[in-house]
Amino acid sequence: ARNRMNITREKESGFEIVRQYYNLVDEHFRTKKQVQDYADMLHKSPKTLSNIFSTCKLPSPLRVIHERVEAEAKRLLLYSNKSAKEIADILGFEDQASFSRFFKNISGQSAVQFRNTQEGKN
């Protein structure tokens, strides 16, 4: 019974760390894009974070950051008239090329293609 209690406690603390991680990503995704940044804020190693996320059957910590940046990029593309360069600046990319590469890798199409296909649906 004691072993089961320890496992339950570990899981609860894991979920708490995951919750804190998601909150930190929401707050800092524009300026911090590395798991190491968040690991430092949580006083954990990136490997420990990865293990916790894996145990909880969640996407990797890096994937969480990428999905948050992707969601904000898509929101800005759909609901603002900002250029890809302006969006790259807002999201903290060094330049438009870095943003464009990131967006194409994660969504399978360029930012301009995404905006155009979505506008065609409205």
Predicted features along the sequence, with ranges:
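Core residues of bacterial helix-turn-helix
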Residues: 42, 91-92, 103
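Helix-turn-helix/winged-helix DNA-binding modules
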Residues: 30-31, 79, 91, 106
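Short, Lys/Arg-enriched, Trp-marked, Pro/Gly-tolerant hinge/linker segments that flank
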Residues: 1-23, 27-41, 55-63, 67
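Terminal helix-turn-helix DNA-binding modules in bacterial transcription factors
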Residues: 55-96, 113-122
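Short hydrophobic/aromatic patch on the recognition helix
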Residues: 49-50, 98-99, 103
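Helix-turn-helix DNA-binding elements, focusing on the entry/boundary residues of the two helices
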Residues: 35, 46, 84, 100
